[in-house]
């Protein structure tokens, strides 16, 4: 099933013509495509972030939607170019470099095919080695979204189990304590989004208004430790105060009401940034 929707994501930014070129290639293949943008502000080369933003988004798009994600520091190398079919019958066109990690874990991938560049590479670009986003991914995505090719015509089938995956931090739950990673930021506002799911946090039996000891480490270095209130939303604490909350993806978040937690405490993201939440009794 194809629905003529094409959603683009990259680390290209919008300061030059790269994204516009991708759009042009897609519309040249099918002028009736409806093209939308997830984001083009992924931190350059940050595959983990690209993977997370797909996970943040795909569930809210209809069945049959085609996504093109280009965060490709290995462009021109031997890494594979693939199309993954999700459990919701959506398609993700991307390099097989870890971009599919969060989709595989949290959404589900039912099949994956390697893009045959003989059939699905834009003509006369075989000597272009640094812009697969235009010549392979946008082009193949447009063909798929428009129904000009089927998923089976993308190329040979690969094993879903062989998809390149990024390492993730497993949540640890102990008595009155839960540990996870700071996966990503709510970028504009500087809130921290952790890997700890709502269900995992609920093992601590929290009630709104409870206080928790929050500890953040970067590798083995202590970065932050303080007592923080758990609330429904930011207004449950005074302006400038920290708050624990469940975010829109049902993960535990840490924010400052009308402030940036990340900037205030110089906190980063990724598997080297870990967070511990301990319930304060009494």
Regions picked out by a protein language model, each given a short descriptive name:
Residues 1-71, 143:
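Alpha/propeptide regions of enzymes that mature by internal proteolysis
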Residues 4, 29-34, 49, 61-70, ...:
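Active-site histidine-anchored catalytic micro-motif
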Residues 11, 140, 257:
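A residue-level signal for conserved active-site and pocket-lining positions in enzyme catalytic cores
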Residues 12-16, 74-77, 259-261:
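Short acidic, Gly/Ser-rich segments with clustered Asp/Glu that frequently serve as metal-coordination loops
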Residues 124-208:
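Anionic-ligand-binding alpha/beta catalytic cores of soluble enzymes and soluble regulatory domains
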Residues 192-266:
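A conserved acidic, glycine/proline-rich C-terminal tail/linker
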Residues 264-282:
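Pepsin/retropepsin-fold aspartyl endopeptidases
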């Amino acid at each position: 099933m194809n629905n003529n929707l094409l959603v683009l994501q990259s680390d290209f930014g919008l300061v030059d013509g790269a994204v516009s070129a991708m759009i042009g290639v897609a519309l040249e293949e099918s002028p009736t495509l409806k093209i939308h943008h997830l984001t083009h502000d992924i931190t350059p080369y940050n595959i983990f972030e690209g993977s997370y933003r797909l996970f943040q988004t795909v569930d809210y798009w209809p069945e049959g939607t085609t996504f093109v994600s280009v965060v490709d520091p290995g462009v021109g190398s031997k890494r594979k170019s693939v199309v993954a079919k999700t459990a919701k019958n959506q398609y993700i066109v991307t390099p097989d470099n870890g971009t599919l990690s969060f989709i595989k874990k949290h959404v589900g991938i039912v099949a994956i095919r390697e893009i045959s560049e003989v059939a699905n590479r834009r003509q006369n670009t075989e000597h272009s080695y640094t812009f697969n986003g235009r010549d392979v991914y946008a082009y193949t995505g447009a063909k798929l979204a428009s129904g000009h090719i089927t998923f089976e015509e993308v190329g040979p089938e690969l094993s879903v189990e062989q998809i390149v995956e990024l390492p993730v931090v497993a949540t640890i739950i102990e008595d009155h304590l839960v540990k996870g990673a700071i996966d990503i930021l709510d970028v504009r506002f500087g809130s921290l989004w952790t890997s700890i799911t709502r269900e995992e946090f609920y093992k601590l039996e929290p009630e709104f208004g409870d206080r928790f000891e929050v500890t953040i480490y970067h590798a083995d270095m202590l970065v932050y430790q303080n007592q923080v209130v758990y609330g429904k939303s930011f207004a449950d604490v005074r302006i400038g105060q920290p708050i624990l909350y469940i975010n829109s993806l049902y993960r535990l978040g840490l924010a400052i009401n009308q402030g940036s937690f990340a900037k205030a405490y110089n906190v980063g993201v990724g598997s080297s940034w870990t967070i511990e939440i301990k319930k304060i009794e009494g």
